[in-house]
Amino acid sequence: MQNYQSHSIKVLKGLEGVRKRPGMYIGDTNVGGLHHMVYEVVDNAVDESMAGFCDTINITLTEEGSCIVEDNGRGIPVDIHPTEKIPACTVVLTILHAGGKFDNDTYKVSGGLHGVGVSVVNALSKRLIMTIKKEGQIYRQEFEKGIPISELEIIGKTKSAKESGTTIEFFPDESVMEVVEFQAGILQKRFKEMAYLNDGLKISFKEEKTQLQETYFYKDGLKQFVKDSAKKELLTPIIAFKSMDEETRTSIEVALAYADDYNENTLSFVNNIKTSEGGTHEAGFKMGLSKAILQYIDNNIKTKESRPISEDIKEGLIAVVSLKMSEPLFEGQTKSKLGSSYARALVSKLVYDKIHQFLEENPNEAKIIANKALLAAKAREASKKARELTRKKDNLSVGTLPGKLADCQSKDPLESEIFLVEGDSAGGSAKQGRDRVFQAILPLKGKILNVEKSHLSKILKSEEIKNMITAFGCGIQESFDIERLRYHKIIIMTDADVDGSHIQTLLMTFFYRYLRPLIEQGHVFIAQAPLYKYKKGKTEIYLKDSVALDHFLIEHGINSVDIEGIGKNDLMNLLKVARHYRYTLLELEKRYNLLEVLRFLIETKDALSLDMKVLEKSILEKLEGLNYQILRSFATEESLHLHAQTPKGLVEFNLDDNLFKDVLFEEAHYTYQKLMEYNLDFLENKDILAFLEEVENYAKKGANIQRYKGLGEMNPNDLWETTMHKENRSLIKLKIEDLEKTDAVFSLCMGDEVEPRRAFIQAHAKDVKQLDV
């Protein structure tokens, strides 16, 4: 075993500024920074694994709000540091830039200067507990806000002399961090990634609050990574290979396959850090791959079609490239792009040699890959011809713009905005209602093409898409230039119904797949047209949704109610809680039937703790009191099933754990408890929901409430005042928070594969709270 003692810890001082400027060290003090703290501690353990001294990492999110990271590595050194004269582990936890990562003999490869990380985590934690198992002893030390509050002390002996490792438990400091609640979903993705990239490393993750427990372990990690990343059927087997360059101490590992897909999905990593912007290693990979495949096509396939180029080779490619190197050079602070020049040549040569060998030894698979590239080249040429029809001249004259476009007078992109409007009738209202100086209108006829299911050559033949590209002025694909964008706000404006939502989704898919920089730079918005218009006498109010309508009715209805024993503000707040309670009950009724039984279960104290037979008796008495006819009833220890004839017809009711664990049931129960915090004596035993309805009816009396199905129902002035006027309107800016997750959702929901989409809908249908049919 490599000797890992205090002299391996190199020190660069200065922890004072971390709490003052945490963003400089962890990116931000929000969700991203919080989880970065976890990664820094876990990365230390993974570095031990890459050095060959650790094969198990356990991460636990505790109910108390802490994160525990435990590894079975060598354990941080506990002997006295030669220059600091305190235990080396204390140095690592309290001095910035102290760590074995600065010593090439200790860690041949590392994700970076992780000695920075663990001390920063300590500085940003209100409490941190370090436990070390080393040389038969168990050591422990506690810190608060980066400062030791105890000496390093021996608290026991290990079960065996060989047992070793480090455990760090930290509680994020809410006085520095804006967010201190960890999100399991974010962490799961990263830990799974780490397990893929490190064969034989077992990462166990547990969240005590939800009892979530998962273990990630892969023997052929990169091959599994490629398999799991495939959104469509693989056309080839997964090709995997690895190599070690002794001169530069660089390990290269690659896995790739081709799928029946138009999109490329290449992921690259350096020392387990995702290089989302690529770099020299990714460039070398694509260079070697293209060279091998193009050479094979030139030597083995005679064709009169266009010769493929590198871009064609990437169509349908799924690949993972992982490098582990001793001194990576990254471009920028984020380490998202590798700059080490020698990596390009190393990776390119390895990939060329291995792919060349594979193609020679596997003629059937070679033919599949070659034909896919040839088809991509053919489609590219067709796309090029179609693109010429949509390509914008240097200075767009009015004559070249789409005929349906009602352009604005301003030529300043910063103040100009374009509305993509569903249908000609709504387009007509929008054209009449707009501010012609800076607002342009482009009506879209029907539903645009689903670009997820179509090749670019077909996409660019779509009249609606051609009109959009021409109007925007920024081009598409290789001709894309965001500097030529004619409008800095592109606003999707559709009806507030199912078709409108579908058109929004189709447009978002198009922007995401082919004009993603417009989303990334904040140019794409969705207009929030009102769903309701309330008119009473000369009063006209527009309300964006049913929640806004209900709140409006409550606020105006209580003015007509003469109530003693509660103030108007308290009454208003109470009724808004009651309104939410009613909403959750009605949603539950859609799933389980018998609203009266649901209310009984929620509102009867200790009902959920009753024996099922006792519960059955109480429920039957309740229903019989309502003159419902019980046709069948059957109870076991864990469930109750009954059929009843009600005024609404024959209904079935099932009572079991599915109901009790339903998120909506829990929400309804919680909301009812909130209601009970109010003094309800003023109701004089009147039902709170009946009273809510009474208040709403006062506001509805003599009023006309119109629900808009389409923008075309609104006159130009209404549309201007509610949806287009800068002072009044509400816009949603499109953002991409997680590129991979977004990509997966678009592929799943908009792609060709029916079964995965059906499974997704079935899994999430119960979580839909509003469904417009």
Curated annotation (Swiss-Prot):
Cytoplasm recorded as keyword:
yes
Gene3D superfamilies xrefs: 3.30.230.10, 3.40.50.670, Histidine kinase-like ATPase, C-terminal domain (3.30.565.10)
Residues annotated to bind Mg(2+) 1: 422, 495
**Toprim domain location, by residue?**
416-530
Catalysed reactions, as listed in the record: ATP-dependent breakage, passage and rejoining of double-stranded DNA
Q: EC number(s) for this protein?
A: 5.6.2.2
Name any one GO molecular function: DNA topoisomerase type II (double strand cut, ATP-hydrolyzing) activity
Where does it localize? Cytoplasm
Entry superkingdom: Bacteria
Transcription regulation in keyword set: no
Similarity comment = Belongs to the type II topoisomerase GyrB family.
Assembly and binders: Heterotetramer, composed of two GyrA and two GyrB chains. In the heterotetramer, GyrA contains the active site tyrosine that forms a transient covalent intermediate with DNA, while GyrB binds cofactors and catalyzes ATP hydrolysis.
Name of the molecule in the record = DNA gyrase subunit B
> What taxonomic ancestry is recorded?
Bacteria, Pseudomonadati, Campylobacterota, Epsilonproteobacteria, Campylobacterales
